Amino acid sequence: MSLSRVSVTAVRNLHPVTFSPSPRINILHGANGSGKTSVLEAIHLLGLARSFRSARLLPVIQYEQLACTVFGQVELAEGGHSSLGISRDRGGEFQIRIDGQNARSAAQLAEILPLQLINPDSFRLLEGAPKIRRQFLDWGVFHVEPRFMATWQRLQKALRQRNSWLRHGTLDAASQAAWDRELCLASDEIDEYRRAYIKALKPVFEQTLSELLDLEGLTLSYYRGWDKERELSAVLATSLQRDQQIGHTQAGPQRADLRLRLGAHNAADILSRGQQKLVVCALRIAQGHLVSQARRGQCIYLVDDLPSELDEQHRRALCRLLEELRCQVFITCVDHELLREGWQTETPVALFHVEQGRITQTHDHRE
């Protein structure tokens, strides 16, 4: 799948624009502050209904504008196309349109337009809180396991109910037991989906990483959020008093984590920023392979400032892996000459110059 047309209005410093990207490689180049990253942010908004640059919406909406909007036409892997649109206003409200109809949730966008982001903050996947790694894991499971979303919603409902009565004691014993049973059932299913996903991801990740970096001894493991030797029901019973004291459930899938270690150490404590970036690239490219296998389609990759922290050898290796995915890629850089030799002659590559918020398509960089 790929975006064949993108229209952006009132996103940061971008002038209203409609452009037609290449179905393969798109390089957006220009000076710092020209608006290159804002183009990626607009596409990210279209696919996930949120920004990757700010948790707050207001900075995304152009000054003195009431809302920002992004529209896109997606060429589907199975043929045909789908039209997507999103508008977000200053009050935080958003409207999603899919093929002319109102949609209820951002998950519907994500299903049609699976996006992968690689940017200078990618190291947070290794260094950041477990929540970031759970989001990475669950993004992957969502795109390969059709039952995941419904089970996830059951889990969240049961968890909210349990946490509410832990804080307020509003449920009788029978209701408490019923919600605990539902929580345990949904938790076991989520754990099963996650374990199956990690089992499929690990060999693809290891192979991908070996083409980017020689890191003997790097291991990827999964912690499910409670003792692997015990049933969750037993863990919840044991920790009930403590859960009541702090007002929330300590054990369960909401505490899961991915652990990357190099020997006896956390990988984030040992690796340089450049090495961390390559590890994250390998993880995200591996996810792309699994999406392709499960959906007979491809992710779309948003790569912000690709040359950052990578030498020429590693830039070329990363470009080669992205090219082998045969997917659509949007890459930003200051100097497109740094990426000139990264692609096969037959691969379509489109150049877009971004200057003061205006986007101009130039030419295939080999012309």
UniProtKB/Swiss-Prot annotation:
GO terms for molecular function: ATP binding; single-stranded DNA binding. InterPro entries: DNA-binding_RecF, DNA-binding_RecF_CS, P-loop_NTPase, RecF/RecN/SMC_N, RecF_2. This is DNA replication and repair protein RecF. GO terms for biological process: DNA replication; DNA synthesis involved in DNA repair; double-strand break repair; SOS response. The RecF protein is involved in DNA metabolism; it is required for DNA replication and normal SOS inducibility. RecF binds preferentially to single-stranded, linear DNA. It also seems to bind ATP. It is found in: Cytoplasm. PROSITE patterns: RECF_1, RECF_2. Its main location: cytoplasm. SUPFAM superfamilies: P-loop containing nucleoside triphosphate hydrolases. The keyword Ribonucleoprotein does not apply. NCBIfam families: recf. Gene3D superfamilies: P-loop containing nucleotide triphosphate hydrolases (3.40.50.300), RecF/RecN/SMC, N-terminal domain (1.20.1050.90). Pfam families: SMC_N. It comes from Pseudomonas fluorescens (strain SBW25). It comes from the Bacteria. Belongs to the RecF family. ATP binds at G30, A31, N32, G33, S34, G35, K36, T37. Keywords: ATP-binding, Cytoplasm, DNA damage, DNA repair, DNA replication, DNA-binding, Nucleotide-binding, SOS response. One of its GO terms (cellular component) is cytoplasm.
